[in-house]
């Protein structure tokens, strides 16, 4: 089963709770760090679920269903804020004990990863807000705009799936980062293409200027999200090799 198929919202994911570091520090710093890594992996999976909800929200026409999904995304964002703080506090507590220089460096890198994962959640929430604004102002995208955003969302999903595979992979080599770089380059290049195309399409009166603003907000936020994903992968590979 691939990560994409396995990341589906479950009832227990709707509530805030840590799974691996709830009982405080373990007997050794190494064991505590291992538990924190498991918690970070779970945190990353939550952000992938959030992005799946964003994709659902994009096409949702039923207002009641839309608001329900939007509220779930907001809830996940609040959970993400709390998870970031709890994991960071735990790692800070672990770092205050007797640690090897290697373990101290590992904690530093993990703290960086946690911050970047929370930024992914922020981006998902920003995308949801952009979609909500588009709907509130009765803006409608053309078929071409929808196709372009579909492709951008698929690229971002690919980046998230790769991130989660890396987080669950026990042994890593430096070349494991290459697929993530390739996806990130695709996202950046596609963003640049869409930015140029948007200016042309507005000039050709294919849609209104404000429609283009909402559209490019989503394109730009998707590209930012991809940056945060790559930062997580870089941190994890730096820690494991």
Task: State where each predicted segment sits.
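Cytosolic, long alpha-helical scaffolding segments
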Residues: 4-241
């Amino acid at each position: 089963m691939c990560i994409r198929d396995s990341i589906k919202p479950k009832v227990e994911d709707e509530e805030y709770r840590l799974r691996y570091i709830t009982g405080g520090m373990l007997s050794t710093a190494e064991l505590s760090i291992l538990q924190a890594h498991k918690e970070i992996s779970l945190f990353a999976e939550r952000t992938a679920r959030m992005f799946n909800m964003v994709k659902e929200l994009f096409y949702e026409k039923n207002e009641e269903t839309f608001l329900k999904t939007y509220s779930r995304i907001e809830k996940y964002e609040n959970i993400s804020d709390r998870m970031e703080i709890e994991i960071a506090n735990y790692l800070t507590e672990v770092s205050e004990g007797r640690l090897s220089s290697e373990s101290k460096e590992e904690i530093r890198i993990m703290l960086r990863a946690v911050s970047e994962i929370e930024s992914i959640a922020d981006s998902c929430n920003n995308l949801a807000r952009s979609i909500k604004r588009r709907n509130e102002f009765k803006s409608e995208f053309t078929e071409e705009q929808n196709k372009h955003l579909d492709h951008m969302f698929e690229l971002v999903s690919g980046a998230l799936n790769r991130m989660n595979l890396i987080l669950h992979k026990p042994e890593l080599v430096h070349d494991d980062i290459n697929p993530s770089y390739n996806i990130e380059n695709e996202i950046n290049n596609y963003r640049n293409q869409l930015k140029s195309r948007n200016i042309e399409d507005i000039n050709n009166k294919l849609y209104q200027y404000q429609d283009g603003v909402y559209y490019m907000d989503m394109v730009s936020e998707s590209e930012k999200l991809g940056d945060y994903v790559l930062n997580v992968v870089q941190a994890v590979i730096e820690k494991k090799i």
